[in-house]
């Protein structure tokens, strides 16, 4: 008798991707975050769909429609807070996923890595346009400040900003198109995720030892399905605790005030997951320079496969690069903290130092430590 999952044209694809997929036997819990990101994406699409049924993308009613969802819709408050805090969980998983990729040298699978960078940019774009939708003070001013950065582009900047706004300021046209973008982008992300998985399954997964694991593979199901299930349960528990006990802890108090173009908040800042990039943007006095640094802060991830000269895969047996890696993580946390602080001394100075350190570590220190460790091996 033929096994249906191995012969059916559609089930065969699922079987090769999630059931009979040969997987290294030693991958640790740090490899769980890929599946957790998939779950986060599904949660966001489902909760977002139900929110879109009640939300109105009009400047006069957007704020009150969000209030209506929380007060009058059955479990609307839960759907709204799961969606808002689900975004935070998404980015926590995303940062850990990228961090693991850097630590264990997953960037050598360059196609998968580069699609991952595109996914990172797309997710950031989705989160940004989504943050604007509740039409609170920070939503409005965040949209105004960040879109205005495009005016730094020589010659076409001002025209480009007015084109994105749909007028001469952030208004009804802007909100409507941002809602349209926010609705379509998660499906574009889903398409890129499939390409990401396609490239990954072409080469096979990396593993903590950094050695070739072809001689030691096990089927994905049941070993890693059970392991992923545990991760998913922990993620859902963390998300539920966040959404039910501390729903507004990661939000901004200014967003409880409806958008007012005549009143600027004291400190304009984006959501916490953008603060590191925002700190890099603010640390450069020149507008165009700041925008380029902002883009480079993520795009520099593409440099990892190019700058890697190490004879060893991953950092597990490389103490010098390990130290530099953890310095990089600490520096990233400092940037995140500084991004949320007001623009005054000593934060401006510390932000500029942390921004320079961020790029120096990736471009200079990591390749240098690779060379040093290669020479130590030769001794």
Curated annotation (Swiss-Prot):
Heme b b562 binds at residues 83, 182. Heme b b566 binds at residues 97, 196. CDD domains: cytochrome_b_C (cd00290), Cytochrome_b_N (cd00284). Binds 2 heme b groups non-covalently. Gene3D superfamilies: Cytochrome Bc1 Complex, Chain C. It is found in: Mitochondrion inner membrane. Keywords: Electron transport, Heme, Iron, Membrane, Metal-binding, Mitochondrion, Mitochondrion inner membrane, Respiratory chain, Transmembrane, Transmembrane helix, Transport, Ubiquinone. The chain crosses the membrane at residues 33-53, 77-98, 113-133, 178-198, 226-246, 288-308, 320-340, 347-367. One of its GO terms (molecular function) is metal ion binding. GO terms for biological process: mitochondrial electron transport, ubiquinol to cytochrome c. GO terms for cellular component: mitochondrial inner membrane; respiratory chain complex III. A ubiquinone binds at residue 201. It is a multi-pass membrane protein. It holds the Pfam family Cytochrom_B_C. Its cofactor is heme b. Belongs to the cytochrome b family. The cytochrome bc1 complex contains 11 subunits: 3 respiratory subunits (MT-CYB, CYC1 and UQCRFS1), 2 core proteins (UQCRC1 and UQCRC2) and 6 low-molecular weight proteins (UQCRH/QCR6, UQCRB/QCR7, UQCRQ/QCR8, UQCR10/QCR9, UQCR11/QCR10 and a cleavage product of UQCRFS1). This cytochrome bc1 complex then forms a dimer. Component of the ubiquinol-cytochrome c reductase complex (complex III or cytochrome b-c1 complex) that is part of the mitochondrial respiratory chain. The b-c1 complex mediates electron transfer from ubiquinol to cytochrome c. Contributes to the generation of a proton gradient across the mitochondrial membrane that is then used for ATP synthesis. Heme 1 (or BL or b562) is low-potential and absorbs at about 562 nm, and heme 2 (or BH or b566) is high-potential and absorbs at about 566 nm. This is Cytochrome b. It comes from Necromys amoenus (Pleasant bolo mouse). The gene is MT-CYB.
């Amino acid at each position: 008798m033929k096994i249906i999952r191995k012969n059916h044209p559609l089930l065969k694809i699922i079987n090769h991707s999630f059931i009979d997929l040969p997987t290294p036997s030693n991958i640790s819990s740090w490899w769980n975050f890929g599946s957790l990101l998939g779950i986060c994406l599904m949660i966001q699409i489902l909760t977002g769909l139900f929110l879109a049924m009640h939300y109105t993308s009009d400047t006069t009613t957007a704020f009150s429609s969000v209030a209506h969802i929380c007060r009058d819709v059955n479990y609307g408050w839960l759907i709204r807070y799961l969606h808002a805090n689900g975004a935070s969980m998404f980015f926590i998983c995303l940062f850990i996923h990228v961090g693991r990729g850097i630590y264990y040298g997953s960037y050598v699978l360059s196609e998968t890595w580069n699609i991952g960078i595109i996914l990172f940019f797309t997710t950031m774009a989705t989160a940004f346009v989504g943050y604007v939708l509740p039409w609170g003070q920070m939503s409005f001013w965040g949209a105004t400040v960040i879109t205005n950065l495009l005016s730094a582009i020589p010659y076409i900047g001002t025209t480009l900003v007015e084109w994105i706004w749909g007028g001469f300021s952030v208004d009804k046209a802007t909100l409507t198109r941002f809602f349209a973008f926010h609705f379509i982008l998660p499906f574009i992300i889903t398409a890129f995720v499939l390409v990401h998985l396609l490239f990954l399954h072409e080469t096979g997964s990396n593993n903590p030892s950094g050695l070739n694991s072809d001689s030691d593979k096990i089927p994905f199901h049941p070993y890693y399905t059970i392991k992923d299930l545990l991760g998913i349960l922990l993620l859902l528990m963390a998300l539920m605790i966040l959404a039910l006990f501390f729903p507004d802890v990661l939000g901004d108090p200014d967003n409880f005030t409806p958008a007012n173009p005549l009143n600027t908040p004291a400190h304009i800042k984006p959501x916490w997951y953008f603060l590191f990039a925002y700190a890099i943007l603010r640390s450069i006095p020149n507008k165009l320079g700041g925008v380029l640094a902002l883009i480079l802060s993520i795009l520099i991830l593409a440099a990892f496969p190019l700058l890697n000269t190490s004879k060893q895969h991953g950092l597990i047996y490389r103490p010098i690069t390990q130290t530099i890696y953890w310095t990089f993580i600490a520096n990233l946390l400092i940037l995140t903290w500084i991004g949320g602080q007001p623009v005054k001394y000593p934060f401006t100075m510390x932000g500029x130092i942390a921004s320079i350190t961020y790029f120096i570590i990736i471009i200079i220190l990591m390749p240098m430590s690779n060379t040093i460790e290669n020479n130590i091996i030769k001794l």
